[in-house]
Amino acid sequence: MRSHYCGDINQSHLGQEVTLVGWVNRSRDLGGVVFLDLRDREGLVQVVYDPDLKDVFEMASTLRSEFCVQIKGVVRARPESQINSQMKTGEIEILGKQLTIINASAPLPLSMDNYQNNSEEQRLKYRYLDLRRPEMAERLIFRAKVTSSVRRFLDGNGFLDIETPILTKATPEGARDYLVPSRTYKGQFFALPQSPQLFKQLLMMSGFDRYYQIVKCFRDEDLRADRQPEFTQIDIETSFMSAEQVMEKTEQMMRGLFQDLLNVDLGDFPRMTYAEAMKRYGSDKPDLRNPLELVDIADLVKDVEFAVFNGPANDVEGRVAALRIPTGASLSRKQIDDYTKFAGIYGAKGLAWMKINDLAAGMDGIQSPVLKFLTESIVNDIISRTGAQTGDIILFGADKANVVAEALGALRLKAGEDFKLLEGEWRPMWVVDFPMFEKINGGFHAVHHPFTAPRGISPAELAADPAAAISDAYDMVLNGCELGGGSVRIHNAEMQSTVFSILGIEAEEAQEKFGFLLEALRYGTPPHAGLAFGLDRIIMLMTGASSIRDVMAFPKTTTAACPLTNAPGFANPVQLTELGIAVIEKVKTEE
């Protein structure tokens, strides 16, 4: 039905007859000549119909937005005065000779020209219309190019694309599972995989030493701008490769991806330990474009007569830190109050501050509600350590170390945006040496997942001091977003059982949930390591989209619903009976 895509027509086609199909983006009658912009996935081209061809002209006059049409015509150059530099095809136009209306369009339920006027609900309900917009089409085309580039790289490096099951067994990976009832085994359930983690490890044990898969994963968790109940991973696993080798190989893949598709050289991937990242940036995925850093000052204020400072400064679990914002002395009291409220979202009970109005004026040039508690010597030490200059403001965090990191880390990002401090476009990095476990409500939880190997210790040493263990894990971070995370895996049954025990998974439960893994670990398991990238997040960053919903064809809402299909929905009672499931109706009580 077509000879070319609309967006591909250019001056090399001058004088040629072409056949195009697509949708009417816009139609207008100017002085007895009908102009229409025809759109397909590759872009737009202008088509002109003049009255010389009466029947065709009259038909063209009836066209409205989103009519699906086929046109035949001759490519010609636009007059100099009508060249549109904003269009890829802006130097040419099609003189229409024939026109076929394939399908008319009903009045549109949403605006195609001013899509900002459409609600998120409307855009998702009529997604097939929203995806016709060039911006959305470009993102999905870009997504296809990314997956193609990834496949070429991995195929070329000896990786095998192997599928793993979608119907599997529930395993604890940090979020709730989506469950699928079994009709054959009534009362029993499959789970949709949160990741292919265990199956890809089993593939390593099977001898497939380089595996990859671009795979759907499912997590029933609270949603944010960068989360969806179903998402796509670039999943990678290797045998007989160290963490260093896995990082080198995947870094090479990411460099090639950005070079091929954006013509961007990502430069160096510096490495930073988890401890250093939390200390300097208050985050385990720091945005290195932001030059601001947290500075510890507990040693300077541990003896001041101010409990807000001296309490955390003398608490082994506490922290007192400062954040200098260049030119921040310009902040009004209301703006500081807004920053205080913002810090409160992350657990901070308040926000002490110090304005450096005039460094040369000594204490007279300093403004702060806590100045009366600080000696001139301490103030000078704080200014020296933070590098503050005249016109700057220093914000203070004093609390438990995790609260200070979260609150000042978030303020660091906010101030970086507010004061336009970001430097450079792309700043990749690796974060390494994560703790193996974290304490939550008195018990240990895996920082990554229960199959991550500790670095350089035996099962006995791990059991003796779990809190001190460092995992052999690594996260790739770009501009403050975690692109992917991975680790060396446990390949020893004793070590795996020890980790389960530390996590409170007793032997009987471990056998019930992971017996197949523990059994497999007994039969010559090779050392193996891997990594998984969030494909949706990578596309979001590379295209500049504000949400992963804008780089997925048919995403869910933030409440995990699909307005297009009205999913989820109620099941047929007959089907529920076959599955052995009874729905408990919520009974309304009379007041």
Swiss-Prot record:
Binding, L-aspartate: E173, R219, H448, R489
Q: What is its EC number?
A: 6.1.1.12
* Catalyses which reaction(s): tRNA(Asp) + L-aspartate + ATP = L-aspartyl-tRNA(Asp) + AMP + diphosphate
Q: Which GO terms describe its molecular function?
A: aspartate-tRNA ligase activity; ATP binding; nucleic acid binding
Taking the record's annotation, the residue ranges forming a coiled coil are none
Which cysteines bridge via disulfide bonds?
A: none
Q: Where is this region: Aspartate?
A: 197-200
- Extract the Pfam families matched here: GAD, tRNA-synt_2, tRNA_anti-codon
Location of the protein in the cell: Cytoplasm
Residues involved in ATP binding: R219, D220, E221, Q228, E482, G534, L535, D536, R537
Query: Could you mention a single GO BP entry for this protein?
Result: aspartyl-tRNA aminoacylation
Keyword annotations of the record: Aminoacyl-tRNA synthetase, ATP-binding, Cytoplasm, Ligase, Nucleotide-binding, Protein biosynthesis
Major place of localization? cytoplasm
Mind telling me which CDD domains this protein's record contains?
AspRS_core, EcAspRS_like_N
Origin: domain of life: Bacteria
Which GO terms of the cellular component aspect does the record hold? cytoplasm
Enzyme class of the recorded protein, top EC level = ligase
Read off the Gene3D superfamilies from this record: Bira Bifunctional Protein, Domain 2, GAD-like domain, Nucleic acid-binding proteins
Please explain the role this protein plays, according to its UniProt record.
Catalyzes the attachment of L-aspartate to tRNA(Asp) in a two-step reaction: L-aspartate is first activated by ATP to form Asp-AMP and then transferred to the acceptor end of tRNA(Asp).
| Quaternary structure (record) | Homodimer.
Q: Do you know which PANTHER family this protein is assigned to?
A: ASPARTATE--TRNA LIGASE, MITOCHONDRIAL, ASPARTYL/LYSYL-TRNA SYNTHETASE
**Which protein family is it in?**
Belongs to the class-II aminoacyl-tRNA synthetase family. Type 1 subfamily.
| NCBIfam families hit by this protein | aspS_bact, PRK00476.1
Protein name as catalogued: Aspartate--tRNA ligase
